[in-house]
Curated annotation (Swiss-Prot):
UniProt name for this protein: E3 ubiquitin-protein ligase RING2
Gene label: Rnf2
Species assigned in the record: Rattus norvegicus
Residues carrying Phosphoserine: 41, 143, 168
Cross-link position per record: Glycyl lysine isopeptide (Lys-Gly) (interchain with G-Cter in ubiquitin): 112
Lineage, top ranks: Eukaryota, Metazoa, Chordata, Craniata, Vertebrata
Disordered: annotated segments: 157-206
GO cellular component: cytoplasm; euchromatin; heterochromatin; MLL1 complex; nuclear body; nucleus; PcG protein complex; PRC1 complex
Reported modifications of this chain: Monoubiquitinated, by auto-ubiquitination. Polyubiquitinated in the presence of UBE2D3 (in vitro).
Polar residues: bias regions: 176-191
Amino acid sequence: MSQAVQTNGTQPLSKTWELSLYELQRTPQEAITDGLEIVVSPRSLHSELMCPICLDMLKNTMTTKECLHRFCADCIITALRSGNKECPTCRKKLVSKRSLRPDPNFDALISKIYPSRDEYEAHQERVLARINKHNNQQALSHSIEEGLKIQAMNRLQRGKKQQIENGSGAEDNGDSSHCSNASTHSNQEAGPSNKRTKTSDDSGLELDNNNAAVAIDPVMDGASEIELVFRPHPTLMEKDDSAQTRYIKTSGNATVDHLSKYLAVRLALEELRSKGESNQMNLDTASEKQYTIYIATASGQFTVSICQ
C-alpha cells in the first residue's frame, strides 16, 4: 500500500506502509444486518470509559493528538500544568494544551450509555462518602494502636538506656574509688575476709577489705519500679488530715526503713505547709520520726514489717 504526496518541489514524496503478519492475515468483521441486538453490561465498558488519572468516568473528554488517549479535560490540563509535558499513559511528549482536542462524540456515547449521569455521580459520591467514613474510623483506631505500641517501645528503650548509663556511671565511680583507696591504704595488708562495708553514698558500690570496688548491677539489684499503697491503721491512727491513703512509686531497692523515713518527711512537710511554717528544725525533728509499717495478712490482722 503506497501513497504519493505532491509537495512544492519538483519531485513527489512517496510513503509506503508495510503491513504486519497480523494485518495481512486478519479478516474484516462482518456487519450485523439482521437486526440482532447484543446486550452488554455498562460495567464491562467501565475500563473503556474511565479516565486514567482520576479513575472515574470521563467528563468533558479531551483526546491527545499524538497517541489518541482520552482524559478528562480538568485532569489532563492540571497534569500538563503541574507535571511533565507528556502523556500520563504512554509518556509521549505533549507540548501544551494545543496537543489536545475535545472529543464530543465520545461524550455523546457516554451520555447514550448512561442517560442519567447526574444520578450515577450522586450514587458514586454516596459510596465514596461511606467508604471514607469507614476507612477514617479504621485509620484512627489503627493510628491509636500504633501510637500505643511506639510509646511502649520508647519507654522500654529509655529504661534500658538509663540502666546502661547507671551501670557505666557505677563502673566509673568504682574505678575512681579503687584508685583513691589504693593510694590511701597502700600500707595495709589485704586479709582474707568475706565482710563487705557499704559506702555512705547511694552510688551503689560495695567495698571489701581488699579495697576493691564492686559495682552493683542495677538490673540484678531489683531496680524495677513498684507501686505501694499506704493506708492508715484502722485502730492506731487518729481520724485527722494526715490519715489519708498514700500512693508511692519507688524502685525495688527501697527498704522498709527508707519508706518509713520518707513517710515521716512527707507528712511533716504537709503539716508545715498546712500551718504555713517553714522551720528547718521542725523538719529535722520530723525526719527523725519513724512510722511503723504493717502488712495486712488477713481480714483484721496485721503483721509488723521489720526495717532492713
